[in-house]
Structure formats: structure tokens, C-alpha cells
């Protein structure tokens, strides 16, 4: 009789280890152990969690998202033994969740409460700050889309920056609308051999910094709380405590950190006053990281040269907000992650993670519910 690794064995250690670990129960007994004091994203599970069982048990997967028939087929074909449950009406969701082992999409509170036996939720969101408390407190493993949108967000971040440095927002675009050929009213700037400071080296920080270095010849400095190898294009990578030492050195300061208790209003008066008067601030992470009153003062009083925001607090930004009156500020409506291939990338990640789950392999984008990212 064919056997495979138990999915419940895959998740058996999470109760003791927390949802920060994606376990790989296919590892042989006596597998590698982590170094004392370390907290890796992937931990190889050892013998007690490796269970042999018949391979015929289906994986009941509830879909809590709008997907086309072709997209559902892609997910269904990701692994053998997948039973997709696609509720057509809201009233059917609770019953579907009650029998599901996996939920894909954006389950509402009622669905989460009914999902007593769910072991894993693959959420469509990149950030966690707006997810239901019931989901964050649920014992299930949670994965998200944290790196799916990063490449296109990086392009948007650099687009915001170029619109400032090359006078596109201040002059070129308004003058074009008026059919005017007029010299720039603001000093034009370049990025070559300038310094980028990245706050956060997750997907967004990685993609922006790589493009800035190799595409524009910028030097990259960065801070991030996670221990990680320094990418070859990054000159210096330090812990967050180095932030205020980094800020005065940079010509562009990028906010690419997640929204957590530690990062609320991280970018305030102290940071903006420490920046060069010729420096730019770019935020493509979350609006809550910025003290917007301090940013408005920084722009109006000339503490910094300009800023580009794809995110604000609240959203949409009210017409009477002080930011609308700021010079050399560009705001886009939180659309930096949008692109025609967005849905393709989402489905591709979901299918890959489902394949991994069915095979007892480590999942991608496992969230640490305690840290908030």
C-alpha cells in the first residue's frame, strides 16, 4: 500500500513552536538541529512528527476568493488528492470551513470561527495589520503574499522617486497638459552614485535596492531586524538600532518595513530633521509608519527636498489633509502593487504552496503572528 507523510505530522510541532516555523516532516529522523538561540524561518522536523499513513486521505481545501475556472483548475492540479470546496453563497461558507483543512483567500470572521479544524490559511494579503483578530489568534499556520507584489512595487517606488528628481510631477506633466514648453521650476537631480537607505529588507526593500544599485549605480545602506546574509549589492546591513546613524548619510530614504507595534510612526520629526536637506523620502509600505504631520512640516519648511507616497493614513486621504498642500510631494492611491500579472502571480504562489503542503515540504511566506510579519 502506498504511504506518504501525514499533513497533521507536518503541523504537529506548531503548538509548541509557534506559527513562526514551517515544518518539513519529510526530514529523516535525527535531522539537522538549529543553533542555540536561533529562530529560523524553516525548521526541519524530526522523528515524532513523521507519520506514515495511507495516501488516499483527501485534502479538503476551501476557496474564500473569487477565482476563474481556469485558476481553480491550476490550483486543483497542484497536487494529487486535492478536494476543492468553493461555496457559491455566503450562507455556505461556515459549513465549508467546518470541514476544511486548508483555506485559500480572505476568510471573514464567521468563516474563521467555523474553521475549528483548519491547519493552514493562505491569505491574499501582503500585510497583517488589517487581518481579523480571530485569524491572528487561530492556531493555524498563516502564509501571505509578502513577496508576490514586490517587483512591481519596486518599480512604483523608483517611479515616485524619478518623478521628483527629474521634475516630472512639478513641471513636465502639468506643462504637458497645458501644451507648454517651459524650463523646470525646480532643480533637477540625478541618482548616480547617490546613497539609498532601505528601512526593511524584505521583498520590497530587496527589489528596490537591487534595482537602485544595478540600474542607477546607487550605494545601498539598509537596516532590518531579521538576521540575514548581506546581499552583494548592499554596502552595509545593520539592525534597526543603526537607523539614526544611517539617516544623515542617505540621499533617498525608503520605507519598506511592515506595519507593527514597533514601526508605528517610525518616520517622525527626529528622522526628517536628521535627513539631508537635499534628500527624498519614499513610502511604499504602510501609511501608519509615518508621522504625517511631521512630514508635512518637513516639506513645507524645507527639512527635506521631496517625498513620494503610495500609502497614507487614512486611505483615501481626506481633501482637507495638510499633505495635499505640500510642495514637491507625489501621492499615488495605494496602487503600487497593481499590474496585469498580479493575479497570475497570486495563483502561482498558491499552487506552489499547496503542492508543498501536500508533500510535507516547508511553506513559502510563513507569517510570525507575534511579530506581525
Where are these regions (language model features)?
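Rossmann-like dinucleotide-binding domain for NAD(H)/NADP(H)
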Residues: 278, 284-373
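Rossmann-like adenosine-cofactor binding region
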Residues: 225-322
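Signal peptide processing junction and immediate N-terminal pro/mature segment
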Residues: 25-35
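An N-terminal-biased, well-structured beta-alpha scaffold segment characteristic
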Residues: 7, 34-141, 268
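Glycine-rich, N-terminal phosphate-binding loop of Rossmann-like dinucleotide-binding domains
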Residues: 14, 107, 125, 257, ...
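Hydrophobic/small residue at the entry helix of a nucleotide-binding pocket
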Residues: 204
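Phosphate-binding beta-alpha-beta segment of Rossmann-like dinucleotide-binding domains, i.e.
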Residues: 140-195, 199, 207-211, 215, ...
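N-terminal secretory signal peptides and thylakoid transit peptides that target proteins
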Residues: 1-18
Amino acid at each position: 500500500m502506498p504511504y506518504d507523510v501525514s499533513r497533521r505530522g507536518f503541523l504537529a510541532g506548531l503548538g509548541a513552536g509557534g506559527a513562526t516555523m514551517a515544518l518539513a516532516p519529510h526530514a529523516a529522523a535525527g535531522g539537522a538541529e538549529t543553533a542555540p538561540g536561533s529562530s529560523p524561518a524553516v525548521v526541519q522536523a524530526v522523528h515524532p512528527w513523521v507519520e506514515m499513513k495511507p495516501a488516499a486521505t483527501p485534502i479538503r481545501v476551501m476557496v474564500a476568493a473569487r477565482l476563474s475556472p481556469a485558476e481553480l483548475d491550476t490550483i486543483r492540479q497542484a497536487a494529487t488528492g486535492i478536494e476543492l470546496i468553493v461555496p457559491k453563497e455566503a450562507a455556505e461558507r461556515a459549513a465549508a470551513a467546518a470541514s476544511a483543512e486548508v483555506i485559500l483567500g480572505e476568510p471573514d470572521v464567521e468563516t474563521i470561527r467555523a474553521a475549528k479544524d483548519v491547519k493552514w490559511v493562505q491569505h491574499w494579503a501582503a500585510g497583517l495589520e488589517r487581518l481579523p483578530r480571530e485569524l491572528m489568534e487561530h492556531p493555524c499556520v498563516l502564509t501571505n503574499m509578502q513577496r508576490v507584489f514586490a517587483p512591481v512595487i519596486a518599480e512604483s517606488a523608483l517611479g515616485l522617486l524619478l518623478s521628483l528628481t527629474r521634475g516630472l510631477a512639478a513641471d513636465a506633466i502639468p506643462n504637458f497638459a497645458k501644451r507648454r514648453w517651459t524650463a523646470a521650476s525646480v532643480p533637477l537631480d540625478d541618482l548616480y552614485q547617490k546613497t539609498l537607505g532601505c528601512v526593511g529588507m524584505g521583498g520590497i526593500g530587496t527589489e528596490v535596492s537591487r534595482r537602485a544599485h544595478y540600474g542607477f549605480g546607487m550605494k545601498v545602506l539598509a537596516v532590518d531586524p531579521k538576521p540575514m546574509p548581506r546581499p552583494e549589492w548592499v554596502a552595509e546591513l545593520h539592525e534597526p538600532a543603526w537607523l539614526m546613524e544611517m539617516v544623515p548619510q542617505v540621499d533617498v530614504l525608503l520605507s519598506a518595513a511592515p506595519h507593527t507595534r514597533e514601526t508605528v510612526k517610525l518616520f517622525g520629526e527626529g528622522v526628517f530633521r536628521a535627513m539631508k536637506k537635499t534628500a527624498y523620502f519614499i513610502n511604499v509600505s504602510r501609511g501608519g509608519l509615518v508621522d504625517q504631520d511631521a512630514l508635512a512640516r518637513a516639506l513645507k519648511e524645507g527639512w527635506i527636498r521631496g517625498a513620494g507616497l503610495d500609502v497614507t493614513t487614512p486611505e483615501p486621504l481626506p481633501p482637507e489633509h495638510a499633505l495635499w498642500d505640500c510642495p514637491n510631494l507625489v501621492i499615488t492611491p495605494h496602487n503600487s502593487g497593481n499590474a496585469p500579472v498580479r493575479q497570475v502571480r497570486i495563483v502561482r504562489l498558491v499552487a506552489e504552496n499547496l503542492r508543498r503542503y501536500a508533500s510535507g515540504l516547508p511553506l513559502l511566506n510563513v507569517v510570525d503572528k507575534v511579530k506581525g510579519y
